[in-house]
């Protein structure tokens, strides 16, 4: 059971790391912004990499409504994370180096050549946070039936990380864990020492090697084509500058946030232009040539025909699609990124109408109401470089690193 807990803990920590201020993109996209606006955005981004302590609140939500073939009329998940965060000097330096990695290859190189960065980051990073998860009733019922255990619609998991020990209040989490019945209160896991041991034993080098698309495909077994396709797509899209020609950024009207003047930058992605571009064709053909899409992959002739159809029907198919991000920057010096959000929303009405007309979807499977996919993320930052008091729970039971590693080896 502890090996499963270890995997879960790593996922939780990685989730919290996704909105680390020091991991901000090194060079923001400026597009056609004027010099002053680009300088403001760039300076704020650079300042974020020197933030040693702050508070943050994040929201991640996904919603599927009225999709043909989906056994649920609606499935929604909302994850909220809030807390205080701090880094010591070594962790901040490590985070700055990790933040400079802009591609899958960069990350793999750091894992292979500098595993100590990950050790320094986790041993010197502290936080006191809570993760709140809310799922729709239909989805909770479906998950419960599949898992054979009652999945609640709401779940709260308090977390504290300090001195390399991750403390988890398992009171609400325990009923969902195998063998967790009766567990409650705080449990501390020596995660920092586990990461140190993993680095010493070459686990990071092995993980870096497994990030190679060919290795992923070989490890995928029967699903090797899918694994290779996913890795190929990730590699193709790992360069943040590769698709800038399909992006636009504008400075919208400034806003007031708790008495602070905030500049608002909105970046949009032109999906229709992208899928009509040579870059999109090259991306797909690269996957075809690699064999990642399997024996039924489209041929060059298929792609040419498909591109012609997209040119005719694309506006109808994608008229309900929005893909944009918003960055909020404090205007007064020192400027910081006080908020970021992303939105992918697709009203599928046009696509489903066309599918019904072609006979791809039977009339009796067409949704009667709204049909859409929406994914939203938001992060708000504050209290930059102010002292954050992060205390460890006094009554926590500690699980030693040796016990965690021994359990992982036997499972």
Give the role of each language-model region.
Residues 1-9:
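Bacterial N-terminal signal peptides that target proteins for export
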Residues 19-23:
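Sec/Tat signal peptide C-region and signal peptidase I cleavage site
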Residues 9-18:
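Bacterial N-terminal signal peptides
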Residues 25-411:
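Subset-of-secretome marker
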């Amino acid at each position: 059971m502890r090996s499963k807990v270890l995997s879960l803990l790593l996922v939780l920590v990685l989730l919290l790391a996704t909105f680390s201020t020091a991991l901000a993109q090194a060079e923001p996209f400026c597009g056609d912004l004027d010099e002053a606006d680009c300088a403001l955005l760039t300076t704020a981004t650079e300042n974020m990499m020197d933030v040693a302590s702050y508070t943050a609140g994040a929201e991640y939500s996904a919603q599927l409504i009225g999709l043909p073939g989906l056994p649920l009329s609606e499935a929604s998940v909302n994850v909220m994370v809030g807390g205080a965060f701090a880094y010591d000097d070594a962790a901040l330096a490590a985070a700055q180096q990790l933040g400079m990695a802009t591609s899958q290859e960069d990350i793999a190189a750091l894992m292979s050549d500098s595993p100590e960065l990950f050790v320094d980051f986790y041993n010197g990073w502290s936080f006191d946070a809570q993760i709140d998860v809310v799922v729709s009733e239909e989805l909770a019922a479906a998950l419960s039936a599949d898992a054979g255990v009652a999945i609640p619609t709401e779940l709260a998991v308090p977390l504290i990380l300090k001195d390399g020990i991750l403390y988890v209040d398992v009171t609400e989490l325990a009923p969902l864990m195998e063998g967790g019945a009766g567990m409650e209160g705080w449990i501390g896991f020596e995660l920092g020492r586990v990461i140190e041991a993993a680095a010493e034993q070459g686990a990071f080098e092995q993980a870096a090697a497994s990030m190679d698309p060919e290795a992923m495909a070989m490890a995928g077994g029967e699903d090797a084509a899918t694994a290779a396709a996913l890795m190929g797509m990730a590699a193709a899209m790992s360069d943040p500058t590769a698709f800038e020609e399909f992006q636009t950024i504008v400075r919208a009207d400034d806003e007031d946030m708790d008495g602070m003047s905030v500049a608002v930058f909105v970046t949009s992605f032109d999906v229709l232009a992208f899928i009509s571009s040579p870059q999109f064709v090259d991306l797909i053909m690269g996957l075809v040539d690699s064999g990642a899409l399997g024996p039924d992959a489209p041929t060059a002739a298929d792609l040419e025909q498909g591109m012609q159809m997209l040119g005719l029907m694309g506006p109808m198919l994608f008229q309900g699609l929005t893909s944009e991000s918003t960055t909020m920057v404090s205007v007064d010096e020192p400027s910081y990124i006080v908020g970021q959000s992303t939105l992918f929303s697709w009203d599928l009405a046009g696509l489903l109408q066309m599918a019904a007309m072609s006979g791809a979807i039977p009339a009796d499977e067409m949704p009667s109401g709204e049909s859409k996919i929406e994914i939203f993320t938001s992060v708000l930052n504050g209290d930059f470089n102010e002292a954050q008091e992060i205390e460890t729970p006094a009554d926590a039971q500690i699980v030693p690193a040796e016990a965690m590693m021994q359990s992982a080896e036997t499972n």
